[in-house]
Amino acid sequence: MKSGRFIGVMSGTSLDGVDVVLAAIDETMVAQQASLTWPIPVHLKKGILDICQGQPLTLSQLGQLDTQLGRLFAQAVNALLARQRLQPRDIVAIGCHGQTVWHEPTGEAPHTLQIGDNNHIVAHTGITVVGDFRRRDIALGGQGAPLVPAFHHALLGHPTEKRMVLNIGGIANLSLLFPGQAVRGYDTGPGNMLMDAWIWRQCAQPYDKDAAWAKEGQVILPLLQKMLRDPYFAASAPKSTGREYFNYGWLERHLTAFSGADARDVQATLAELTAVSIAQQVLLNGGCERLMVCGGGSRNPLVMARLAALLPGIEVSTTDKAGISGDDMEALAFAWLAWRTLAGLPGNLPSVTGATEASVLGAIYPANPITQS
């Protein structure tokens, strides 16, 4: 069974940077050793957002973006290697999620698309890459997401305590880790995505640091109620979603009847939407003893405070308290999934995604042995 140092690369729906994590992994442990966040240039971020919101583009433009992101991911990996004074031969493999630009797991021809050419990552790092993790699950009738609940269970499952792990990225997803039961998990709806989109359009800021802007506003209850009536929130699991659904266009449609609303009030309402939609799903599943939060949204004090208020009797804390950085959880998960793929072990959970069977995930892009010598 392949063990050693792995690197995980994650660029999520928040588009707040490329997260790169170094970890030692074997069948008994995942030990994080280092991490960094690499910036995404504005022109690449704009290109990704345009695709996700259905803007027309040529195949040439898509191909260029695929190449540019692959090179960017390689730059991020090489920066971490340089910082840690490591060589390509010191790393078993890179697990790269890629950048999701479209996710449509239902319908006549279900599909998902992550870009960031893994061939360029191999060529510019000299390290084997495992990528394209989601499409096998979709081919087996699953949602292709979320994939992190298996990792949450491996790291944070408890023999007696009823736990849930909440990842608040651009989209929020919940993992249900109940003793004696199959792991379940699904996307609850928007996490940071709508909050980030609104403050970007209004203030040209990438995110609302410390929720300072939202704290100046008041929740617009009719707007909140209107947004919560979206059918996604009432849909049964397994389910998954992304920026192709919860995007700025979605927000604009809900704001048509609130054209005179104060921008700060809209931001406060979007923070409340994230907290309420998550809390509803926690309670719908019978609650838990501990809700462990990771992802960028775990650093939003308003969302965290509202979750604690909406979930009395449940301990709401970040995964940092359990010794796992909430900022690095997803990148770490894809390093772990790369290890499982190379070990010939399944990476999906049918109880989470709805796939017909558990399967080894991803495609392997081998490094040139000469490069690694």
Swiss-Prot record:
CDD domains: ASKHA_NBD_ANMK. One of its GO terms (biological process) is peptidoglycan turnover. Keywords: ATP-binding, Carbohydrate metabolism, Kinase, Nucleotide-binding, Transferase. Pathway: Amino-sugar metabolism; 1,6-anhydro-N-acetylmuramate degradation; Cell wall biogenesis; peptidoglycan recycling. Its EC number is 2.7.1.170. NCBIfam families: PRK09585.1-1, PRK09585.1-3, PRK09585.3-2. Catalyzes the specific phosphorylation of 1,6-anhydro-N-acetylmuramic acid (anhMurNAc) with the simultaneous cleavage of the 1,6-anhydro ring, generating MurNAc-6-P. Is required for the utilization of anhMurNAc either imported from the medium or derived from its own cell wall murein, and thus plays a role in cell wall recycling. This is Anhydro-N-acetylmuramic acid kinase.
